[in-house]
């Protein structure tokens, strides 16, 4: 009810704050017998870990995961899996100047109006720090999906600010800090980010996520559509302001003769629907695009108010990502995997498939 759990049969409950002792999650509903060790999860966490390049927050967190329960002798037991990640490099003093004011574009104001109290340290519960447990849970989902169905979930950045990144090769994605699928564009991205940091400003990005290998039939009609659940999950990622599948908003300019993929004995002739029709998977790749807004914590002074409603000028200190999108790719992959494993289990429960 309080919005901290994702999923129906494969449930992930996320807990913690940016500057608390630890963050983590409880994964409930994981099938028993899945080989699992901390290294399986750590590999994914290392992909989103802060402080790995000059273009992301310089907060130094090892993000070492601890498996507290649900695994015995290297396999899952079917009971809840507790995952813990300790916070080791919080600097709460950096936020003393915004304890009583609200950052423009940040959740500060909305949290205060909802709860009547807020934790200003690193954004508290609204911090992107809370995506680490999501990635940890997603690592479990990815491994199960790959083992059971051969499903592969991966993503990349297709645009950073005004710079479009033409797709060249999946092989280029892990070789740079941006998850860019085109190594030739990386120097331009680096130069842009260096100038952005000097300006004390931030920028948005576009992320693409693709799931391949899943069968047709996953998803429920009407209100539990597969695409609806994907959009719901993706909007839970900090700074996401838009989600589309397949051709997305480009569908507006398409005619039905173009958008509706013809079906042949060999399969579909196109995939403008992004792998989902009627809320149910078609067996084609699931393709998702995310629009991520610029980070709201910047050094540029902006107008705001304090808790008394008085006008103030706000400048955010501390260590922040000038572009949340740079580390968003592994998070978006995790969220897509979590939705897919949930629907895979629901399909098995209802239809036996």
Curated annotation (Swiss-Prot):
Its EC number is 4.2.3.5. Pathway: Metabolic intermediate biosynthesis; chorismate biosynthesis; chorismate from D-erythrose 4-phosphate and phosphoenolpyruvate: step 7/7. Reduced FMN (FMNH(2)). NADP(+) binds at residues 48, 54. SUPFAM superfamilies: Chorismate synthase, AroC. Its cofactor is FMNH2. Keywords: Amino-acid biosynthesis, Aromatic amino acid biosynthesis, FAD, Flavoprotein, FMN, Lyase, NADP. GO terms for biological process: amino acid biosynthetic process; aromatic amino acid family biosynthetic process; chorismate biosynthetic process. It catalyses: 5-O-(1-carboxyvinyl)-3-phosphoshikimate = chorismate + phosphate. GO terms for cellular component: cytosol. One of its GO terms (molecular function) is FMN binding. FMN binds at residues 125-127, 238-239, 278, 293-297, 319. Belongs to the chorismate synthase family. This reaction introduces a second double bond into the aromatic ring system. Homotetramer. This is Chorismate synthase. It comes from Bordetella parapertussis (strain 12822 / ATCC BAA-587 / NCTC 13253). The lineage of its organism: Bacteria, Pseudomonadati, Pseudomonadota, Betaproteobacteria, Burkholderiales. The gene is aroC.
């Amino acid at each position: 009810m309080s919005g901290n759990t994702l999923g129906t049969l494969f449930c992930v409950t996320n807990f913690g704050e940016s500057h608390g002792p630890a963050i983590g999650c409880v994964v409930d509903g994981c099938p028993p017998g899945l080989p699992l060790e901390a290294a399986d999860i750590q590999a994914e966490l290392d992909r989103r870990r802060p402080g790995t390049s000059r273009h992301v927050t310089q907060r130094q967190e090892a993000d070492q995961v601890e498996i507290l329960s649900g695994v015995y002798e290297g396999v899952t037991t079917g009971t809840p899996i507790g995952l813990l990640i300790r916070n080791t490099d919080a600097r709460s003093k950096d936020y003393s100047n915004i304890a009583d004011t609200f950052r423009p574009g940040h959740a500060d104001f909305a949290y205060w109006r909802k709860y009547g109290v807020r934790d200003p340290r690193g954004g508290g519960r609204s911090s992107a720090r809370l995506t680490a447990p999501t990635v940890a849970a997603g690592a479990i989902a990815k491994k199960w999906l790959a083992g059971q169905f051969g499903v592969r979930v991966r993503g990349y950045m297709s645009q950073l600010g005004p710079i479009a990144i033409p797709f060249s090769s999946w092989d280029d994605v892990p070789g740079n800090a941006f998850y860019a699928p085109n190594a030739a564009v990386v120097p331009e991205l680096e130069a842009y980010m260096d100038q952005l940091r000097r300006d004390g400003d931030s920028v948005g990005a576009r992320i693409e996520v693709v799931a391949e290998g899943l069968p047709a039939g996953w998803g429920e009609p009407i209100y539990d559509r597969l695409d609806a659940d994907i959009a719901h999950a993706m909007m839970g990622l900090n700074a996401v302001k838009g989600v589309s599948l397949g051709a997305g908003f480009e569908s507006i300019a398409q005619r039905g003769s173009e958008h509706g993929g013809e079906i042949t004995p060999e399969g579909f002739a196109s995939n403008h629907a992004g792998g989902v029709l009627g809320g149910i998977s078609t067996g084609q790749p699931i393709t998702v695009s995310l629009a991520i807004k610029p980070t709201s914590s910047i050094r540029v002074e902006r107008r705001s108010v304090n808790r008394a409603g008085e006008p103030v000028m706000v400048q955010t200190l501390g260590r922040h990502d000038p572009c949340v999108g740079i580390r968003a790719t592994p998070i978006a992959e995790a969220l897509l995997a979590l939705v897919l494993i949930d629907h895979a289990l629901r399909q098995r429960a209802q239809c036996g498939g």
